[in-house]
């Protein structure tokens, strides 16, 4: 007889439960944070933290163990090259669960589970990300122009001061 799982059951059978946890972990590692039910977030936390610990180890055996659970090679590569080394000096506690209230349709309690040190990847493809990127580039371009104009005004001011000093020296 199979040993019962700790925590709430997440689906029909054990195979479906394993697939759901693997898919949730894949989404968490890909996006850095996901919105799901509290029960799924609580079941995902230890699962994801064990995978991050394997990612910190970084050897071939650990990579193969992770590949048995997460089938997306790009996500596994990201786990071992970016996420694992980021938590090098941290002993556990890689994820945070924040409760956000109940879902509108069925009143299910919802939560956001996220990696503690957020990924520093800009979002691509969304209009909001494109406008934020454009807005951040405009001040940089203006800032690039201002020192050049300021430098010419400073140079002319220094030249004027120098000519005044010469004029005063000649008068004395």
UniProtKB/Swiss-Prot annotation:
Annotated Low complexity bias: 132-143
What protein name is recorded for this chain?
Large ribosomal subunit protein bL17
Keywords assigned: Ribonucleoprotein, Ribosomal protein
Oligomer and partners: Part of the 50S ribosomal subunit. Contacts protein L32.
What are the leading ranks of the lineage? Bacteria, Bacillati, Actinomycetota, Actinomycetes, Streptosporangiales
Q: Where is this region: Disordered?
A: 123-172
InterPro entries attached to this UniProt entry: Ribosomal_bL17 (IPR000456), Ribosomal_bL17_CS (IPR047859), Ribosomal_bL17_sf (IPR036373)
- Which PANTHER family does the entry link to? LARGE RIBOSOMAL SUBUNIT PROTEIN BL17M, RIBOSOMAL PROTEIN L17
Which Pfam families does the annotation name? Answer: Ribosomal_L17
Which residues are connected by disulfide bridges in this protein? none
A cellular component term from Gene Ontology for this protein is: cytosolic large ribosomal subunit
Q: Which organism is it from?
A: Thermobifida fusca (strain YX)
Q: What one GO molecular function would you report for this record?
A: structural constituent of ribosome
Family membership noted in the UniProt record: Belongs to the bacterial ribosomal protein bL17 family.
One of the GO biological process terms? translation
- The keyword Ribonucleoprotein is assigned to this record: yes
